[in-house]
């Protein structure tokens, strides 16, 4: 009998050769019903995996990330199977599970439409009802290439040829459909809930993300274990469409994109007002937190990028130019320039901690298919900061940065959790340095009572990091802020300080961003607030709406009074009906609508409507100004 150690530490005995599903059944029928796979000694496997030695096993359900991936990966194979049944001359690309669903890439002559998606979904449901067993098969390299050659699957052959000579070629088969895949998968197609499955859209995708390769058709889908979960997800998608920043950006006249500069946003006046408010807030908070601000050039020479490592490891994402027969690059990151600024002076241990921040414009060559409004652009502004310190100051500085991040996100109403990424297999720096840094990160998070997830071995080779995952108003997660201990750049740029002993030492360096990219953070705010910015951020804080031409002069006086108090106010002078003007202001998400007519002119008042509460009655201009200023000042 084998001894199987379960997640709760208990030990279960089971016969050798039993599979994971047998183990789940021996624990409880409910667990067996919910099981979709398992982790055996940390490796994710399917329910058919045989157990032949003592091991640790964690049974996975759909609620586990790895279990959800198994379920949706099987869904993607059913999608590919259905497409192969319905259309001739189909060549398969890849079909992985992704966050909230799955996709599969196809090379086929037929251009897929919404009606095709309905037909494909019906065929998928047939395959599910057939409850075809899903079998794992292993082939020799030559056998696999020959098999896929006979099937005309050129892309699969390319993938096999990219594998190592001795690597196991694994495939999964259901009925007459077979696919190159490492798995794992569910035991049969019938394990997918056919009423909780949907196909969402078709998009173009270059093979292997290379715009010089074939354009494939990518079908996106999702699947759940309950119909109610699918319905909730579709509802969230509909809500997300209403909040889509590209749609609202156009409606609110915030920004635009043009073919003359693909992937680079053009900010309009309304958008610049919001951006500048974000920057002003950033500068105020950083001054209070003891940061210096620097600015470094956008174009720097090849030697710098070779020294930083970007020339060798990031070149495909960079833009280049030649000046006076010398190679230069447009900066994709601010960090190397900040290292040059540090090296311009000699620092003493008494100067630490040294906090240096920069709002630097960077450019990165993203593939056109990956661009997505402000969320994925080719030019953006990073709010980088580098903190140089003594080893004894690490924990205190980490706490200071986390406090600053928390301050920012609380102002915007974001909840968040943290992911801590630890030392990978290949890393620079001693175990002692890494352990000290990781323990400092953990200590600060626990001291602050911040929940965090540990991603073992997922840190960069040059240091551990924590990522802040924001949760927006409709429950989506976004990664923005990162706090990274960097052991690499201080070495590459030979950063030093004079210690108490009079000798040169290497400083500890933290690299951090809070907004991340300001433009991307702006997009998140648009969607988070659904365009209804809080008063301090709103491009137009008030609009004055005269009922008739005879009220226009009074409207102009009010506008001047508000503007003189620093309130962003516009006068609607259009020759339109009052109802139209009010509706238009509501569509433009203006916080305050101030209507003026005969009574208001006579009494020197305004009739006030707010975006959230509608008509709130008549107020004097002075009273309203005081209320607006208090609301602006009370931004947090």
Curated annotation (Swiss-Prot):
Q: Name one GO cellular component term.
A: cytoplasm
Where does the record place it? Cytoplasm
Q: What is its main location?
A: cytoplasm
What the entry lists under PANTHER family is as follows: THREONINE--TRNA LIGASE, CHLOROPLASTIC_MITOCHONDRIAL 2, THREONINE-TRNA LIGASE
Stretches the record annotates as Catalytic: 244-534
Q: Name one GO molecular function term.
A: tRNA binding
Q: What's the encoding gene here? A: thrS
CDD domains noted in UniProt:
TGS_ThrRS (cd01667), ThrRS_anticodon (cd00860), ThrRS_core (cd00771)
The cofactor note from the UniProt entry for this protein is: Binds 1 zinc ion per subunit.
- Subunit field text: Homodimer.
Q: What does this protein do?
A: Catalyzes the attachment of threonine to tRNA(Thr) in a two-step reaction: L-threonine is first activated by ATP to form Thr-AMP and then transferred to the acceptor end of tRNA(Thr). Also edits incorrectly charged L-seryl-tRNA(Thr).
The reactions it catalyses are: tRNA(Thr) + L-threonine + ATP = L-threonyl-tRNA(Thr) + AMP + diphosphate + H(+)
User: SMART domains in the record, alphabetically?
Assistant: tRNA_SAD (SM00863)
The protein, known as: Threonine--tRNA ligase
Can you name the source organism? Answer: Natranaerobius thermophilus (strain ATCC BAA-1301 / DSM 18059 / JW/NM-WN-LF)
Picking any one GO biological process from the record gives:
threonyl-tRNA aminoacylation
